[in-house]
UniProtKB/Swiss-Prot annotation:
<feature type="domain" description="ACT">
    <location>
        <begin position="601"/>
        <end position="675"/>
    </location>
</feature>
<keyword id="KW-0378">Hydrolase</keyword>
<dbReference type="GO" id="GO:0008893">
    <property type="term" value="F:guanosine-3',5'-bis(diphosphate) 3'-diphosphatase activity"/>
</dbReference>
<dbReference type="GO" id="GO:0008728">
    <property type="term" value="F:GTP diphosphokinase activity"/>
</dbReference>
<dbReference type="InterPro" id="IPR043519">
    <property type="entry name" value="NT_sf"/>
</dbReference>
<dbReference type="InterPro" id="IPR006674">
    <property type="entry name" value="HD_domain"/>
</dbReference>
<dbReference type="Pfam" id="PF13328">
    <property type="entry name" value="HD_4"/>
</dbReference>
<dbReference type="InterPro" id="IPR004095">
    <property type="entry name" value="TGS"/>
</dbReference>
<dbReference type="GO" id="GO:0042594">
    <property type="term" value="P:response to starvation"/>
</dbReference>
<dbReference type="Pfam" id="PF19296">
    <property type="entry name" value="RelA_AH_RIS"/>
</dbReference>
<dbReference type="InterPro" id="IPR045600">
    <property type="entry name" value="RelA/SpoT_AH_RIS"/>
</dbReference>
<dbReference type="InterPro" id="IPR012675">
    <property type="entry name" value="Beta-grasp_dom_sf"/>
</dbReference>
<dbReference type="GO" id="GO:0015970">
    <property type="term" value="P:guanosine tetraphosphate biosynthetic process"/>
</dbReference>
<comment type="function">
    <text>In eubacteria ppGpp (guanosine 3'-diphosphate 5'-diphosphate) is a mediator of the stringent response that coordinates a variety of cellular activities in response to changes in nutritional abundance. This enzyme catalyzes the degradation of ppGpp into GDP. It may also be capable of catalyzing the synthesis of ppGpp.</text>
</comment>
<feature type="domain" description="TGS">
    <location>
        <begin position="360"/>
        <end position="421"/>
    </location>
</feature>
<comment type="pathway">
    <text>Purine metabolism; ppGpp biosynthesis; ppGpp from GDP: step 1/1.</text>
</comment>
<comment type="similarity">
    <text>Belongs to the RelA/SpoT family.</text>
</comment>
Length: 677
């Protein structure tokens, strides 16, 4: 077996033979009912990256299709970048574009991530949290957009467990207890539904369904719902043979239990963006408990669980028609291709795609009755571009329900929208302040790119001022602007604004520059330096380095620790690492006016509110420092833990930064991390 032999002698971090991983990934792909080529590619997905096998060899052995899938997966894993942010953005872009060429590449990546999350326990806690956070931000929305709900739910629960293990265990125990207490009532309601449908001549399968742990946690955290109010909702699925029976069941449910007004949703007539279809109703059941029922056909149920992968099931059964999920995903993929062709860089691509990725939809109508699906918050201009690019480009006004309506006002589900056009009209720069769909943004930008330089500069200024909020360009000095221009190798502010307006620079990234975040890390670590800035006695010193565990800075009490290679590592006097055996000597600073820059690490607890991080960045910039790295973690009581690595000249400079940070509203605690004993 090629995969087994190729990975011979390789082991996972858990100590298991590496081959167990591709076998598990292939098993997940098989459970998704994909074709044999996808299963083969899953078994081989790490062969090109981790072994001497080449794409050409795989092509000869298994065919071009399998080799291309494996190569596509491998290329996603091989990308190397200067920063983690850059890596995440570019990897995401590559994955999305790979998906537009062959959806199986990303399905294998989803399966790969699923097994990695299942076996996360052997990694360090900080690495588990980082991988779990990335999974929640990228892979869970992706699985949802493709309609693969059981994968999305599992990834969410595994990520929740990795990021908040204690909360996970507490909530799991609560759910287990609640489930046992609910069992009798669940069986009673289920039996009442079955009897009612049998008496009505409707053949159906009925079972109770429960929310997974992460969804319960999110409802408690974000919507501030109490645990018992979430668990008191009794939810059931009813599966029938055809669409007519779905509506018959709905009628019987409303005869059995009292329906709650305005709580019926028809996703059969208007499916969700990922192809999901069902009838949903909320009623008042026995003893006054809330009862939710989701009604599906067998095909709808399969699409609800399998999403786009249900397409392969139907093909194997001899049906060639695409499912609703498949058709909608194909349209979505085509829209992603259009976005990629219109944007200037990876950051802009991701900013545009995010709005398309996990949307809450509204449904509006054209005057002829065609349904147009848009994300929540979409405006008439978004609607115009959804109908056709030419309609958007020549839009001058709109009527909603035959009445004038502002172009910038958000639409609501059920409205009939009529766009007024003028062949001499053109898109306005101001539209970019309120449109929400990627299609509208990219089409407007595409048109504006063809306009004169002056308009591009105006567009760039609008976008940058929006990104800088609550600041604007006028708040920054000529010297601050010059610093940003020099970092970007640009000669003037107009040139910078034009680059933003043309989409060649990201407004959000430039905004970070203005509040102290550089595109290129400055040379502030200075791991090696000339020993003339300090004295270390009585040692003979070769190379001298600053310890990265405690980050000593000019003015600190310091100790030299000599390594076997005659290199002296300078530590803070109170660093815990000094308890390890090494030849030590007191050291002192010689040159107080040293031009060497130092790196200090601060640990900050701040209220988790809008613009909290921006306030910190502004304080650092105002202190004539720059940010080298940042990590964040959510704490209890709506607090955010922020760890900053900043560039400083000496302890006085650091004290000034700390003083400014302590003056920020919402800051609870600030301390320096010196790895203290």
């Amino acid at each position: 077996m090629i995969a087994r032999d190729a990975h011979e002698g390789q082991f996972r971090s858990s100590g298991e033979p590496y081959i167990t991983h591709p076998v598990a990934v292939a098993s997940i792909i098989a459970q998704l009912h994909l074709d044999h080529e996808a299963v083969m590619a899953a078994l081989l997905h790490d062969v090109i990256e981790d072994t001497p096998y080449t794409e050409e060899q795989l092509k000869e052995e298994f065919g071009a299709s399998v080799a291309e899938i494996v190569d596509g997966v491998s290329k996603l894993d091989k990308l190397k970048f200067r920063t983690r942010q850059e890596a995440q953005v570019e990897n995401f872009r590559k994955m999305i574009l790979a998906m537009t060429r062959d959806i199986r590449v990303v399905l294998i990546k989803l399966a790969d991530r699923t097994h990695n999350m299942r076996t996360l326990g052997s990694l360090r806690p900080d690495k588990r949290r980082r991988i779990a956070k990335e999974t929640l931000e990228i892979y869970c929305p992706l699985a949802h957009r493709l309609g693969i709900e059981h994968i999305k739910n599992e990834l969410e629960d595994l990520s929740f467990q990795a990021m908040h293990p204690h909360r996970y265990e507490v909530l799991k125990k609560l759910v287990d207890v609640a489930r046992s207490n609910r069992q009798d009532l669940i069986e009673r309601i289920s039996q009442e539904i079955k009897v009612r449908l049998e008496n009505s001549g409707i053949f159906a399968r009925v079972w109770g369904r429960e929310k997974h742990l992460y969804k319960i946690y999110q409802k408690m955290r974000i919507k501030d719902q109490e645990f018992h109010s979430i668990m008191d909702i009794y939810a059931f699925r009813v599966i029938v043979k055809n669409v007519d029976d779905c509506y018959r069941v709905l009628g019987q449910m409303h005869n059995l239990y009292k329906p709650r007004p305005g709580r019926v949703k028809d996703y059969i007539a208007v499916p969700k963006a990922n192809g999901y279809q069902s009838l949903q109703t909320s009623m008042i059941g026995p003893k006054g408990v809330p009862v939710e029922v989701h009604i599906h056909t067998e095909d709808m149920e399969q699409v609800a669980e399998m999403g786009i992968t249900a397409h392969w099931v139907y093909k194997e059964n001899g049906k060639n028609d695409s499912t609703t999920a498949q058709i909608r995903v194909q349209r979505w993929l085509q829209s992603l291709v259009e976005i990629q062709q219109s944007v200037g860089n990876s950051f802009e691509f991701i900013e545009n795609v995010k709005s398309e990725f996990f949307p809450k939809e509204i449904y509006v109508f054209t005057p002829k009755g065609r349904i147009v699906e848009l994300p929540m918050g979409a405006t008439a201009v978004d609607f115009a571009y959804a109908v056709h690019s030419d309609v958007g480009n020549t839009c001058v006004g709109v009527t909603v329900e035959h009445k004038p309506y502002p172009l910038s006002k958000a639409l609501e589900s059920g409205q009939t929208v009529n766009i007024i056009t003028d062949p001499n009209a053109h898109p306005e720069v101001a539209w970019l302040n309120f449109v929400v769909t990627a299609r509208a943004k990219t089409r407007i930008r595409h048109y504006l790119k063809q306009r004169c330089e002056e308009d591009a500069v105006k567009l760039g200024e609008v976008e940058l001022n929006v990104a800088l909020q609550p600041h604007n360009l006028g708040d920054f000095s000529i010297q601050q602007i010059r610093t940003v221009l020099d970092a970007l190798a640009l000669s003037s502010l107009d040139e910078l604004l034009r680059e933003i307006g043309l989409g060649n620079q990201s407004a959000s990234m430039i905004a970070h520059q203005f509040v102290g975040v550089p595109l290129e890390s400055a040379n502030t670590k200075n791991l090696e330096f000339e020993s003339k800035i300090l004295t270390i006695a009585p040692m003979q010193v070769g190379k001298t380095q600053f310890a990265q565990c405690c980050h000593p800075i000019l003015g600190d009490p310091i100790v030299g620790c000599c390594t076997e290679k005659n290199t002296v590592v300078v530590h803070h006097q109170h660093c815990a690492s000094l308890k390890n055996a090494c030849r030590q000597s007191l050291a002192k600073w010689d040159n107080v006016q040293s031009a060497v820059n130092f790196e200090a690490e601060l640990q900050i607890e701040i209220l988790n509110e809008q613009n909290a991080l921006l306030s910190l960045m502004t304080a650092i910039s105002a202190s004539e420092s720059s940010l080298q790295n940042i990590w964040t973690e959510e704490l209890e009581n709506n607090l955010l833990l922020v760890i900053l690595q900043v560039c400083v000249k000496d302890i006085k400079h650091l004290a000034n930064i700390v003083h400014r940070i302590k003056g920020i509203t919402g800051v609870v605690n600030v301390k320096r991390n010196i790895n203290e004993l």
